[in-house]
């Protein structure tokens, strides 16, 4: 028997001892988010949700720099489950994972896994698996089982099986029977499930001493069903049946599988057997089966099952009638479909738009359409006709027949020239039921024409609507104007705006801002200014995103001066300036015309009564510091503080970096004091600048002191910080100390670049410790870090190589490295 091996295992464990209490059904994918949060943490979670939901979002938001040190796993889990969109949750999770001092636990990973699984974001879910393994966080069997189920729900069977083995090998979790059941369930979620994999996992369970229960065999049954192993599936089913575990869920798996395999007769036989055992399938299963029978073109069996449902007292809903009528329509059984339609009416269930759409769209002959209309015409009123139109249009649109929807409306308006007269229109007119569609239906068709890139047809339809005495709604104009603007047709959109005004339809703020955005996209600041005059007439405000975009676009095209002039013209039209756009202009001037021009605009803005914000000050301070004009930046910094603005950590970092690069290390240190006074905590960027500056000033002991201070504040160094300290110590001749931090960097799996290796090598050579220097050199070569010829460190590598060639203690080893192809044959060693 195909299933004899599994049956034997079941019997063996049944004899060993009495079966323990059955494990609960695996946890639902809905996370228990009742973990207690302190009020301050709850407020923190809400603030993070607000920041990440706010548009536009920036990971450099000053508020995030303030909130990040307070992160913990409970807060992260709460925030993740507070987002309605998976993308925001994933953005937040990645941001949180990178914050210094924070480390995810399995609850946080499970929260993210559940969100990604429900959203079917498999690529991100795969990345999360790698992150879980790299984190080496310990987990309970239950938590691990939940993670496995999330992978299974997303169809990531290979990943679920792989992570199961890896976690077990790494000693992060000891799986129990529940964990194995979750893995089996995950495997069963995939239609391409491997029978061999399932049976291998069952053997592992046996070797671990775990019992097989209903929740073990149910996914096994599902796998056999998924893979079309009908005989094995029947064997498992019989085993479950013999143990008294048969329930509605298990029965549903097999009967639905029979339906999927096209074995409708066997499915029907199984249903009758279940009835004999007093196991009733639920209403949903009956509906699924009827749908499957219809899909298999077994309308006869579908109606037999339908009759069985009615005898059991199950009343069909409109969705089930829809499936049956759809099947009848597919087989062109018009009379039976109409008979069922009349039954719906007799039962008091109003036919919905889907059924009307199927009846009207499935039959194309004039006689058939006349027959349908004869059945429904007596019951339809104006509202029903509108419903019919809407159903027809939805059917047209669903089938990408937007042109047919357009022709139908033209027929209703008496325009028959192109495609002839619609038979439905004739029938409606014969019974005085023909009326024009309402504004909503017309708007749907116009919107679909626009989406189908048939803007010209939409314009024609709009004009015909006006000629027939209908007043188009603002939505119709907005849709067409938006479509024109997406195609860059700003002139035509302005013309339609004039027609809109002539028709007595007031444009909305959306209407004008669509055109404004189009003009901004084309860098047409003259046209944009003319449109602003129209906005002022209607009392609308231009969207700052379009103004800012236009300014940025002009600056990107090297027209920063035009951008500034445009902002002046905007103010001249009576619109209040916005610092976001002004800051964009300042930034553009700095990049195009230099820092002085940006500073000049900044002063003009202040002179005109505007109050620059923190971002505007930061842009200038950062630019001045980069230009080695930190003294001027300091004046601006003090000016900002005097106005009550709080500098961000990023602004402090710019100042500290500027002072350090100019050799004013003590002034940089004074900025640290001001940060603490301002209740701002230095971050890793702050300390990196300080450490680099202290080493450059010949104060390596103070650099190490700051390093230890940073780690003591749970601010952990990153790769750049390590490299700054190592290279700085090397320049100060502290090669031994630099090597210690180099090894620590390697332990943290941070990869040094060639500059770090060469700094160490050069430092050891300077102290005449050629053996230590050559050891580091060999490491660099073996790890493939020898710089290529275009690398700025290439000549330094050539120089140190020359020194090793000249030394008898290292030249022979160097020859071997060259022969092995690990370093290029340099001109300096070509004689070897």
Swiss-Prot record:
PROSITE patterns: PPR
Alphabetically ordered keywords of this record: Mitochondrion, Repeat, Transit peptide
Origin: domain of life: Eukaryota
Any Pfam family the entry gives: PPR_2
Transit peptide: 1-27
Subcellular location, record wording: Mitochondrion
GO CC terms of this entry: mitochondrion
Keyword Transit peptide: yes
PPR repeat spans: 105-139, 140-174, 176-212, 213-247, 252-281, 282-316, 317-351, 352-383, 385-415, 438-472, 473-507, 508-542, 543-577, 578-612, 613-647, 648-682, 683-717, 718-752, 753-787
Family (UniProt): Belongs to the PPR family. P subfamily.
Name of this protein: Putative pentatricopeptide repeat-containing protein At5g08310, mitochondrial
């Amino acid at each position: 028997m195909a299933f004899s091996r599994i049956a034997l295992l079941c019997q063996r464990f049944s004899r060993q001892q009495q079966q323990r209490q059955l494990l609960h059904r695996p946890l639902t994918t809905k996370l228990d988010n009742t973990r207690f949060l302190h009020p301050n943490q709850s407020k923190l979670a809400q603030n993070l949700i607000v920041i990440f939901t706010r548009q536009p979002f920036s990971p450099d938001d000053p508020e995030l720099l303030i909130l990040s040190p307070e992160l913990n796993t409970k807060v992260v889990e709460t925030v993740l489950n507070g987002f309605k969109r998976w993308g925001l949750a994933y953005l937040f999770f990645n941001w949180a994972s990178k914050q210094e001092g924070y480390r995810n636990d399995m609850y946080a990973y499970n929260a993210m896994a559940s969100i990604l699984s429900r959203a079917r974001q498999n690529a991100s879910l795969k990345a999360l698996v790698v992150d879980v393994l790299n984190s080496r966080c310990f987990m309970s069997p239950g938590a691990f089982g939940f993670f496995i189920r999330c992978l299974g729900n997303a169809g990531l069977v290979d990943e679920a099986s792989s992570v199961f083995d890896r976690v077990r090998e790494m000693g992060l979790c000891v799986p129990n029977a529940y964990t194995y059941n979750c893995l089996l369930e995950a495997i069963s979620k995939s239609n391409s499930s491997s029978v061999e994999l399932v049976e291998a996992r069952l053997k592992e369970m046996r070797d671990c001493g775990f019992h097989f229960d209903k929740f073990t065999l149910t996914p096994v049954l599902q796998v056999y069903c998924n893979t079309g192993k009908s005989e094995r599936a029947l064997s498992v089913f019989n085993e479950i049946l013999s143990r008294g575990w048969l329930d509605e869920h298990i029965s549903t798996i097999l009967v639905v599988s029979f339906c999927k395999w096209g074995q409708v007769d066997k499915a029907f036989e199984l249903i009758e057997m279940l009835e004999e055992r007093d196991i009733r399938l639920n209403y949903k299963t009956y509906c699924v089966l009827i749908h499957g029978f219809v899909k298999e073109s077994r309308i006869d069996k579908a109606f037999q099952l339908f009759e069985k449902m009615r005898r059991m007292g199950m009343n069909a809903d409109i969705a089930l009638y829809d499936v049956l009528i759809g099947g009848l329509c597919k087989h062109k059984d018009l009379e039976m479909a109409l008979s069922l339609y009349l039954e719906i009416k007799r039962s008091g269930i109003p036919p919905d738009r889907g059924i009307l759409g199927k009846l009207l769209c499935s039959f194309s002959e004039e006689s058939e359409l006349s027959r349908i209309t004869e059945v429904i015409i007596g019951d339809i009123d104006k509202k029903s006709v509108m419903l019919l139109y809407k159903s027809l249009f939805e059917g047209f649109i669903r089938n990408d027949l937007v042109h047919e929807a357009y022709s139908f409306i033209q027929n209703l308006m008496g325009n028959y020239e192109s495609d002839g007269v619609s038979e439905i229109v004739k029938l409606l007119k014969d019974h005085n039921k023909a009326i024009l569609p309402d504004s909503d239906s017309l708007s749907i068709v116009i919107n679909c024409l626009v989406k189908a890139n048939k803007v010209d047809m939409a314009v024609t339809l709009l004009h015909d609507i006006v000629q027939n005495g209908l007043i188009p709604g603002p939505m119709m104009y907005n849709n067409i104007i938006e479509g024109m603007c997406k195609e860059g047709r700003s002139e035509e959109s302005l013309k339609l705006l004039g027609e809109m005004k002539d028709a007595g339809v007031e444009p909305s703020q959306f209407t004008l801002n669509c055109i404004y955005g189009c003009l901004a996209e084309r860098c047409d600041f003259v046209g944009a200014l003319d449109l602003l005059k129209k906005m002022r007439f209607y009392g609308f405000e231009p969207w700052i995103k379009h103004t800012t975009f236009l300014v940025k676009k002009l600056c990107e095209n090297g027209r920063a001066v035009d951008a500034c002039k445009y902002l002046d013209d905007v103010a001249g039209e009576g619109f209040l300036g916005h610092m976001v756009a002004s800051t964009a202009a300042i930034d553009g001037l700095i990049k195009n015309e230099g820092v002085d021009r940006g500073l000049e605009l900044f002063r003009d803005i202040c002179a005109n009564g505007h109050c620059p914000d923190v971002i505007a000050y930061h842009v200038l301070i950062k630019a001045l510091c980069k230009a080695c004009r930190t003294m001027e930046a300091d004046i601006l910094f003090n000016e900002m503080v005097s106005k009550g603005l709080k500098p961000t950590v990023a602004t402090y970092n710019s100042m500290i970096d500027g002072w350090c690069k100019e050799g004013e290390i003590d002034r940089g240190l004074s900025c640290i004091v001001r940060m603490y006074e301002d209740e701002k905590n230095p971050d890793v960027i702050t300390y990196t600048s300080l450490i680099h500056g202290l080493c450059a000033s010949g104060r390596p002991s103070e650099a190490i002191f700051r390093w230890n201070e940073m780690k003591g504040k749970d601010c952990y160094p990153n790769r750049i910080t390590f490299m700054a300290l190592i290279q700085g110590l090397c320049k100060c001749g502290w090669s031994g100390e630099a090597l210690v931090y180099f090894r620590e960097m390697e332990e943290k799996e941070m990869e040094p670049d060639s500059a770090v290796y060469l700094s160490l090598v050069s430092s050891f050579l300077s102290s005449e410790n050629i053996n230590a220097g050559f050891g580091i050199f060999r490491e660099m070569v073996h790890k493939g870090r020898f710089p290529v010829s275009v690398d700025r460190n290439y000549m330094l590598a050539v120089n140190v190589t020359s020194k090793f060639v000249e030394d008898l203690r290292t030249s022979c080893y160097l020859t071997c490295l060259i022969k092995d192809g690990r370093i290029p044959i340099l001109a300096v060693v070509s004689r070897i």
